[in-house]
Design a protein with these regions (language model features):
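Junction motif at the cytosolic side of a transmembrane helix
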Residues: 2-14, 239, 243, 251-285
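Aromatic- and glycine-rich beta-strand/loop motifs that create alpha-glucan
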Residues: 6, 12-53
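Hydrophobic alpha-helical transmembrane segments of multi-pass membrane transport proteins
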Residues: 56-61, 77-149, 174, 178, ...
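Short helix-capping/hinge motifs at transmembrane helix termini and TM-loop junctions
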Residues: 61-70, 92, 149-154, 158, ...
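Transmembrane helix segments
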Residues: 63-68, 182-229
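Alpha-helical transmembrane segments and their short interhelical loops
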Residues: 120-195, 255-276
Length: 285
């Protein structure tokens, strides 16, 4: 259905001598985003990583890990871990962007798009926007399950929404990075394997599940400079949840919100152009 819409749009452009414009590119992005959302509706199991996984992770870490976890000052582990679970679920689910692009390239779908005078980058932008909407669903699931297991934010609604916004911005930035992995891989399975090797340590070598206070010094440095730690700490601060800090922390530890925004913007600035370059190279004869 989306291919037909693109064909109709392309034909109308040719008849009126259409020149590329921002409005036309935006329309291409909307069509490509809708195409990805339609695929999800036809195969709802694609949403398991943003619906089922958050529920399992929340129950597992709150009731299993939380039963033996002691935080400084006797803070609630549930309140501590929910922002970490939010970030971790968004990080692990971001690999769907790379796998989806690798799938489209391997099954010839992108070759069909090349026959149309559409904005080529709309394939990438549409994919990342659709995955951003999936990430928003994941955030909502984490919040609902968190409330069910006893998590409560300590700040006003606007601050809480800002926390979700920071997490979603990082998720969108990471989607561009995983898009590069998908474009470098020759098969979806390869993209998944490589992505797992990158995403797994990124998610777990951080303060998402445990404070970095008692980690070995060399590991604590890595965890403190991990962008996942900055995002998680900033979300905790915006939510008004416990965020134990070392007495003498590094710059990202002392300024988590600034570090999270810098990491996100820098990742988009680097990964988006690189993904566009890789896409042109993969789709140019």
């Amino acid at each position: 259905m989306s291919t037909v819409e693109l064909a109709i749009t392309a034909a109308s452009r040719e008849r009126v001598g259409f020149l590329p414009s921002l409005a036309a590119r935006a329309k291409d992005v909307v069509v490509m985003t809708r195409r990805n959302l339609v695929h999800i509706l036809r195969e709802p199991m694609q949403l398991s990583d943003v619906t089922v996984q958050p529920v399992l992770f929340t129950v597992l870490f709150v009731y299993v890990f939380g039963s033996g976890m002691s935080l400084p000052g006797g803070a609630s582990y549930t309140a501590f871990v929910l922002p970490g679970l939010l970030t971790m679920n968004l990080v692990t689910s971001s690999m769907g962007t790379g796998v989806g692009l690798a799938q489209d390239l391997s099954n010839g779908m992108v070759e069909r798009f090349r026959t149309l005078p559409m904005w080529r980058a709309s394939v990438l932008v549409g994919r990342t926007v659709a995955d951003l909407l999936s990430a928003a669903v994941c955030s909502a699931v984490v919040a609902v399950v968190g409330l069910a297991v006893g998590w409560r934010p300590g700040h006003a609604l606007l601050s809480v929404l800002a926390g979700f916004g920071v997490a979603l911005l990082f998720s969108y930035a990471l989607a561009w990075a995983t898009a590069c992995i998908g474009l470098l891989a020759k098969e979806p399975e390869s993209a998944m394997s490589v992505g797992f090797v990158v995403i797994f340590p990124l998610a777990f070598v951080s303060n998402a599940l445990v404070p970095t206070l008692h980690m070995p010094s060399w590991l604590r440095v890595i965890a403190d400079w991990n962008p996942v730690s900055s995002v998680t700490a900033s979300v905790r601060d915006l939510f008004g949840n416990p965020n134990p800090l070392p007495l003498h922390g590094s710059w990202p530890v002392e300024h988590p919100l600034g570090a999270a925004l810098i990491w996100s913007v820098a990742l988009i600035a680097v990964a988006a152009p690189f993904a566009s370059f890789l896409f042109r190279r993969r789709t140019t004869d």
